[in-house]
Amino acid sequence: MHKFLPIAYFEDKFVPFEDAKISVATHALHYGTAAFGGLRGIPDPEDPGTILLFRLDRHGDRLSKSAKFLHYDISAEKIKEVIVDFVKKNQPDKSFYIRPLVYSSGLGIAPRLHNLEKDFLVYGLEMGDYLAADGVSCRISSWYRQEDRSFPLRGKISAAYITSALAKTEAVESGFDEAILMNSQGKVCEATGMNVFMVRNGQIVTPGNEQDILEGITRDSILTIAADLGIPTCQRPIDKSELMIADEVFLSGTAAKITPVKRIENFTLGGDRPITEKLRSVLTAVTENREPKYQDWVFKIPLNG
């Protein structure tokens, strides 16, 4: 059972979470005309009175750009300002997740984006590990990732996640933890809410942006960290069979962080994951503000400031 943070931002004001309610006729509820983001926050291990948010600037910028697909102009600065105030009002004392959402708040039944009211909301919940930290099993989904020519995949659009929901439930009902989706060319694309990486012969490989993936912020962070560590990286198409015989496979995302993959279909991957574990160790240190080189990725919010 989720434990939601007590205060939400809704209709331009902060209200008790229980009071943030929409009409049954809300356009986004019927047509998926919404876009969302997701950030993790933790109390600073060295100063519990300070909250650390990972890559707030990038998350604000991505949601602002996603909103443009909905014909909604909201600045990244506005998004960041509200999120900072949201954290201060909630005074979290455990690891938590923030969900900002822009959506068509007008009432109606015609699929459109013009002449339609929009709104911006934020809520949050306590969150530990989203997926099992010791690794997950993955099914290759029978559902395919959408194509950018028919869906704005550069935005984090809510409607796109019906495919993720279908793939996730299919995987769980088949006895797996997670699903990996192919794109329309039959190449590895992403998991249900995470980017996919593999390691072969000491090189990190991940599908490039042209493979219809979400341009993940954690993904980008991992590629930067790997390069700084001197680990070779490559962005290119990945075949399904190649993934199954990889030395290491892991998933990345704001909620999932870095999660190892133990098994794909009936192919068990090796238990030694030196590169995955090294990246996970460094990324954890970065999010806890213990890596001076990446301190500009961590936004500090003093709760009593």
UniProtKB/Swiss-Prot annotation:
Catalytic activity field: L-leucine + 2-oxoglutarate = 4-methyl-2-oxopentanoate + L-glutamate; L-isoleucine + 2-oxoglutarate = (S)-3-methyl-2-oxopentanoate + L-glutamate; L-valine + 2-oxoglutarate = 3-methyl-2-oxobutanoate + L-glutamate
UniProt superkingdom: Bacteria
Swiss-Prot/TrEMBL keywords: Amino-acid biosynthesis, Aminotransferase, Branched-chain amino acid biosynthesis, Pyridoxal phosphate, Transferase
EC number, as in UniProt: 2.6.1.42
Function: Acts on leucine, isoleucine and valine.
Name by which UniProt lists this protein: Probable branched-chain-amino-acid aminotransferase
Keyword Amino-acid biosynthesis: yes
Family, similarity comment: Belongs to the class-IV pyridoxal-phosphate-dependent aminotransferase family.
GO terms classed as biological process: carboxylic acid metabolic process; isoleucine biosynthetic process; L-leucine biosynthetic process; L-valine biosynthetic process
Single Gene Ontology MF annotation: L-isoleucine-2-oxoglutarate transaminase activity
Cofactor: pyridoxal 5'-phosphate
Gene name of the record: ilvE
Pathway membership: Amino-acid biosynthesis; L-isoleucine biosynthesis; L-isoleucine from 2-oxobutanoate: step 4/4; Amino-acid biosynthesis; L-leucine biosynthesis; L-leucine from 3-methyl-2-oxobutanoate: step 4/4; Amino-acid biosynthesis; L-valine biosynthesis; L-valine from pyruvate: step 4/4
Pfam families: Aminotran_4
CDD domains: BCAT_beta_family
Listed InterPro entries: Aminotrans_IV (IPR001544), Aminotrans_IV_CS (IPR018300), Aminotransferase-like (IPR036038), B_amino_transI (IPR005785), BCAT-like_C (IPR043132), BCAT-like_N (IPR043131), BCAT_family (IPR033939), Class-IV_PLP-Dep_Aminotrnsfr (IPR050571)
Residue numbers carrying N6-(pyridoxal phosphate)lysine: 156
